[in-house]
Regions:
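Histone-fold recognition with a strong bias for associated Lys/Arg-rich disordered tails
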Residues: 1-155
Length: 155
């Protein structure tokens, strides 16, 4: 994974994972942290795309936040780790960017990678809200058109 190929917003989302893990007392950063981070970014593209899929953004974000509360908690701080599931998403996001002809990994690539390989709780949430790759790409095409991500600040 080449962090230099992440847009400023996607880097902010990854940094948000760490912040959320600390806030919720989790030892591992999980896909749930990334999802909530993507949804709560300032001027969140993912939140706009969720709305375009005719899903109530506030309700979906609330459900995602409930998933954070279910994660194992530790006390006393210590080292923070990236889970295997989250690592797969971060690595696969680069593949998503390349497949779309983009030079940089953006928030939509992170979300698509999560749709492709969701952890158990995320998979259930996506099923509940009927979030599929096809629906997400359709919503994305209405916003993005045929633009390509060729800078680290296109979001």
């Amino acid at each position: 994974m080449n962090i230099n190929k992440f847009t400023q917003k996607s880097l902010a989302a990854v940094q948000g994972c760490e912040k959320l893990a600390y806030e919720y007392g989790n030892q591992q950063m999980e896909q749930e942290h990334l999802l909530v981070s993507l949804l709560t970014l300032e001027d969140s593209l993912i939140l706009k795309l969720i709305a375009k899929m005719e899903i109530q953004p506030e309700m979906f974000t609330g459900e995602a936040e409930k998933l954070l509360e279910k994660l194992p908690k530790v006390s006393g701080g210590g080292q923070l780790y990236v889970s295997n599931d989250l690592n797969k998403v971060l690595v696969n996001a680069e593949d998503e960017a390349k497949a779309m002809g983009d030079e940089y990994v953006s928030v939509e690539h992170l979300f698509l990678a999560m749709v492709k390989q969701p952890g158990r709780a995320i998979k259930e949430l996506f099923r509940l809200y009927n979030i599929t790759r096809e629906r997400f790409l359709q919503a994305l095409s209405t916003v993005r058109g045929n633009q390509r991500g060729v800078s680290d600040n296109p979001d």
